[in-house]
Amino acid sequence: MKLITREIELKLKKNMALPEGEREPVVKFFGGGACTWLISEKEGDILFGLCDLGLDGAELGYVSLSELESLKFPPFGLGVERDSWFVADKTLSAYADEARELGRIAA
């Protein structure tokens, strides 16, 4: 499965025109059982969003699309997947606030 389709790419570009506090995640990725990424921006290969590696809570930051595409999780070597059913219902900053309270991303 392609992680970023043309439609998603266009939505990510539109998000860049909005003030930071109004940007909603456009796409959700997951993998490895506990890893979750909510992505709101893309510039080249670099994505920005809320990232949770299942260790000690989520944080806002940057991640490389090519790195996500290359990840393989044991024991079966499955890669990162896109949640086809994800629809944001709040801003990225609201998801981040909620993740701080819960200790994980709830999306």
Which residues fall in each region the model found?
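N-terminal domain-onset segments
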Residues: M1-G33, I105-A107
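Generic structural hydrophobic/aromatic packing signal, biased to beta-strands
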Residues: V27-F29, G49, V63, L68
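Short beta-strand micro-motifs enriched in acidic
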Residues: S40-K42
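Catalytic Cys-His active-site segments of thiol-dependent hydrolases/isopeptidases
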Residues: I46-G54
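Helix-rich interaction surfaces within compact, conserved domain-sized segments
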Residues: E59-A107
